Amino acid sequence: MMNISEFQINFDESRFVDLRKRIAAARWPDDTSFKGWQHGTPIEALRDIMEYWANGYDWKRKEAELNKYPQYICEIDDISLHFFHIPGKLPNAVPILMAHGWPDSFLRYAKTFPLLNDYSVVVPSMPGFAFSTLPEKGYINNSETADLYHRLMTEVLGYKSYVAVGGDMGRGVVCYLATRYPESVRGLLLTDVGFAKDIATSPDNQLTKEELDYKRAATEWMQKEGAYINIQSTKPMSLGFGLSDSPVGMAGWLVEKYHDWSDWERFSIDDLLDNLTLYWMTNCAQSSVRQYYGNSYTLPPMGKVTVPTAIARFPKDILPVPKPWIERNYPLVQFSEMPYGGHFTAMEAPEPFALALKEFIKNL
């Protein structure tokens, strides 16, 4: 039985009072000798963000904007799944499932809602993120999330087929969808293709110059930037205490990723705080990282993608994989270079993203 109920976001003012008290009572590190972002989030940058979060930022603005769009909670097995379902204005509107990743949320795609009126848009909160719960076992992986999303689209919402969009962990989710349910997934739009492990582990003399450049960049990135993957994959509980108890600690962990993975100069502080507020108020900073554990230890092999695939590549994203590798591994029908934006894709560049998606669907 899958019960479904309407949902609206409503964070009580008392929770913002508590947030401001916690920020005011924060104990900051004494040592300010590390400058810049190479060592993580700088103290002065984080102080400025916390000051604005406590004394200038207005969540109710975002809350009212989001509540204009239909939201629901659906009970599927032992998971409460939150999702937006915005029916298209056209008859027989093409359904689009959009899958976000970490450390973001449904907010990755929220700016595209008014740009995609002709389509039926479905954006779930991944289990463990925002208003969606984890299963009783305490973690989930991309494969299980794909099955959950397919049931949402077909059994709950009644769609026979749909287009799937994903980035970051959402990319893995929709790729499992495409390999497991190719009769239902009409097409796949990806904003990244993950990590090309076969390039990174191949001998240098077997690689093209472009592949060798990628291997060197990927090796350096994993050494300097990839520690979070190992921590979240192995010790999510230990990390979770600080993420749950301190808004400053949570922000320090997340802001670094937003800075390093995005087109930061174009990134709005309100966009950043919208996501931080959602994480803080739902206490999902600790539960969201459980997917790394699930993916590291319980993920089954993925089949080959056979459905038509589009790539929307953003210039400030991390580790862009060489196009020839993508062509070998996906049935590529469209490759769009976005004019700006980074890893958080439609949050940073909603208009170019929406145009690429519309073009892809038109030609399916």
Regions found by a protein language model. Give the residues of each.
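Alpha/beta-hydrolase
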Residues: 2-8, 12-17, 23, 27, ...
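Non-catalytic accessory segments flanking enzyme active sites
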Residues: 15-87, 271, 280, 286-300
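Glycine-rich "HGGG/HGxG" loop immediately N-terminal to the catalytic nucleophile
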Residues: 59-61, 107, 111, 126-140, ...
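Short beta-strand element of the alpha/beta-hydrolase
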Residues: 93-101
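Short amphipathic alpha-helix adjacent to the substrate-entry channel of hydrolases
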Residues: 107-121
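Conserved hydrolase catalytic core segment
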Residues: 115-118, 157-208
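Conserved acidic catalytic loop of the alpha/beta-hydrolase fold
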Residues: 143-162
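C-terminal subdomain of alpha/beta-hydrolase-fold enzymes, centered on the catalytic histidine
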Residues: 232-364
